[in-house]
Amino acid sequence: MNPIIFIIILLTIMLGTIIVMISSHWLLVWIGFEMNMLAIIPIMMKNHNPRATEASTKYFLTQSTASMLLMMAVIINLMFSGQWTVMKLFNPMASMLMTMALAMKLGMAPFHFWVPEVTQGIPLSSGLILLTWQKLAPMSVLYQIFPSINLNLILTLSVLSILIGGWGGLNQTQLRKIMAYSSIAHMGWMTAVLPYNPTMTLLNLIIYIIMTSTMFTMFMANSTTTTLSLSHTWNKTPIMTVLILATLLSMGGLPPLSGFMPKWMIIQEMTKNNSIILPTFMAITALLNLYFYMRLTYSTTLTMFPSTNNMKMKWQFPLMKKMTFLPTMVVLSTMMLPLTPMLSVLE
């Protein structure tokens, strides 16, 4: 792809998200979502192969359906209130449709089926944009309309997402699919605390984006896409392999790493609001995610990974790609837990 065209497309994606985040008019929000969706499709199809085409088509169809639901919710709201203002939804039907549309855009269960398939079919760099930047716009709208969201609906969606994000990743060997299921589970954690403390949702989103960006950057540096190729990285880049494993465990929420902080704070916030059964269930279900991250870590630490094919050993070469921000990202992904007392201002 021509570098100038690529930069224009990236700027369009950024502009689309910014329009959604700063708009107070529903029509502008919808336009921002459409810009965002149409701009990322050429990036997904950077590699011309059937898998990328299929993934882009699936993404286009699901996002179009979500945009249609969003517009339907806006029109119903307009009929009852006569207003285009983003902040408040005056009708329960409009609120329900809007929540479902945003859940579909975020890839939350039960609208999650497109996320693993699309992530698996596109390059790692496109997967990084899809699982990080593309979450900002829908999450910002959810943050703005949270007072009028149906509590039971959003909690049902979040619990389903945490459960399916854990179960779905158990049987995977493809790292992109594992990251996709991890994304579904993280979206569940974010939306579970949204009705109680929306600022906590933003904190969780920031930490999730940092950890996912770090993981994808290291996968791209090593061209790692499967459990098998991950198990051979120790011979190629031993230091980076250790960092990958630490970040994986952080994503699983293992103390004393950064990923434990949002889970701890969310459970604390929900128990303060007299919700006991739900956080208990969420904490138990989080062990599913931790299990498949631990399994990846274990398989990588084996001296010889059990594989049927005769795979050549990787050789240590100096990395040609410049990794300027990687040390900072790894530190943020693994060592933020001591900052937790400073975040008491969120309450």
Swiss-Prot record:
The keyword Cytoplasm does not apply. It is a multi-pass membrane protein. It catalyses: a ubiquinone + NADH + 5 H(+)(in) = a ubiquinol + NAD(+) + 4 H(+)(out). The keyword Nucleotide-binding does not apply. GO terms for cellular component: mitochondrial inner membrane; respiratory chain complex I. GO terms for molecular function: NADH dehydrogenase (ubiquinone) activity. GO terms for biological process: mitochondrial electron transport, NADH to ubiquinone; mitochondrial respiratory chain complex I assembly. It is an enzyme of class 7 (translocase). The chain crosses the membrane at residues 3-23, 25-45, 67-87, 96-116, 122-142, 145-165, 178-198, 200-220, 239-259, 274-294, 325-345. It is found in: Mitochondrion inner membrane. Its main location: mitochondrion. Its EC number is 7.1.1.2. The modification N-formylmethionine is found at M1. Keywords: Electron transport, Formylation, Membrane, Mitochondrion, Mitochondrion inner membrane, NAD, Respiratory chain, Translocase, Transmembrane, Transmembrane helix, Transport, Ubiquinone. Belongs to the complex I subunit 2 family. Core subunit of respiratory chain NADH dehydrogenase (Complex I) which is composed of 45 different subunits. Interacts with TMEM242. Core subunit of the mitochondrial membrane respiratory chain NADH dehydrogenase (Complex I) which catalyzes electron transfer from NADH through the respiratory chain, using ubiquinone as an electron acceptor. Essential for the catalytic activity and assembly of complex I. This is NADH-ubiquinone oxidoreductase chain 2.
